Amino acid sequence: MFQAMGELDGADVKAVESATRERVAAQLASGEYTGWLVEIDGAPIAGAGVLLHQYHPTRQNPDGRPTAYILNVYTDPLHRRAGLATRLIETILAWCRERDIPRASLHTSEWGRPVYERLGFVPTHELRLELTNRVRTGSLP
């Protein structure tokens, strides 16, 4: 997935994949992360996940319920444009609604933006400051 998006290559991919496997395994065990896969004959062709974040209560979320961050949305190139990402996101949103999760957010590529906008996602005014300008390798925090 990281290579397909052009984010990492070579040794960086291996380091990030290893750290991701460890982190996701722990988050799956704790219930903090839930993932969905689409398979054909036992081989994954698409997937997505949701990571629950606990924030302090706010005006929009007065009881401080966890919010959902959707990530790891990926469809194998041979199976794109078949609506798999849309169905995965619809499944995740239904899962969130069943749990009374008040908000779902995500980051998207330009390719994915139309999918999310059709499902009702809107841009927000989030700001970000990168505190390091280097790609970390090895053990990631």
Regions found by a protein language model. Name each.
Residues Y55-T58, S105-H107, W111, E117, ...:
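Conserved catalytic-core motifs of GNAT/GCN5-like acyltransferases
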Residues A48-T58, D63:
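A conserved beta-strand-loop-helix scaffold within acyl/acetyltransferase catalytic domains
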Residues I89, C96-T108:
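Conserved GNAT acetyl-CoA-binding A-motif
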Residues L37, A43-L52, Y69, Y74:
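Conserved beta-strand in the GNAT
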Residues N61-P77, L129:
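Conserved acetyl-CoA binding element of GNAT-fold acetyltransferases
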Residues F2-V24:
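Conserved GNAT-fold acetyl-CoA-binding loop/helix
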Residues H79-T91:
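Conserved acetyl-CoA pyrophosphate-binding loop and the N-cap/start of the following alpha-helix
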